[in-house]
């Protein structure tokens, strides 16, 4: 069999990794081995944090809902329980958006939850 020389293939592979490492500090953007190690780590972090981002947004929505609910004299837990008992199916993303942008609508939902829990509107 003929001997396979890797000159062109290796050069293309190195170029691809160094392109991904553009903007990194020091040797991590200039030399292949440190750049390759950092690119592998960076891609792993990106993969993990794309999944973590879902939970981060959920936490943000809950914090916003809780803050708006407490301004109306009820906490997050009771609000969600009251809405569930009232049969109001609204997700946390929409509820948080209402708390920020449509306070009148959010206040109406709080009143519905309070009625269902018997806390008085």
UniProtKB/Swiss-Prot annotation:
Keywords: Ribonucleoprotein, Ribosomal protein, RNA-binding, rRNA-binding. The keyword Acetylation does not apply. One of its GO terms (biological process) is ribosomal large subunit assembly. One of its GO terms (molecular function) is rRNA binding. GO terms for cellular component: ribonucleoprotein complex; ribosome. SUPFAM superfamilies: Ribosomal protein L20. InterPro entries: Ribosomal_bL20 (IPR005813), RIBOSOMAL_L20_CS (IPR049946), Ribosomal_protein_bL20_C (IPR035566). HAMAP family: Ribosomal_bL20. Binds directly to 23S ribosomal RNA and is necessary for the in vitro assembly process of the 50S ribosomal subunit. It is not involved in the protein synthesizing functions of that subunit. Belongs to the bacterial ribosomal protein bL20 family. This is Large ribosomal subunit protein bL20.
């Amino acid at each position: 069999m003929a001997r396979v020389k890797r000159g062109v293939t290796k050069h293309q592979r190195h170029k691809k990794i160094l392109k991904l490492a553009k903007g990194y500090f020091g040797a991590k953007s200039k030399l292949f081995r440190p750049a390759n190690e950092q690119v592998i780590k960076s891609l792993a972090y990106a993969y993990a944090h794309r999944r973590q981002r879902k939970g981060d947004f959920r936490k943000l929505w809950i914090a916003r809902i809780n803050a708006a609910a407490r301004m109306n004299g009820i906490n997050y837990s009771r609000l969600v329980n009251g809405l569930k008992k009232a049969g109001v199916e609204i997700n946390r993303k929409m509820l948080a958006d209402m708390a920020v942008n449509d306070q009148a609508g959010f206040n109406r939902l709080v009143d519905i939850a309070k009625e269902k829990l018997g806390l008085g509107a």
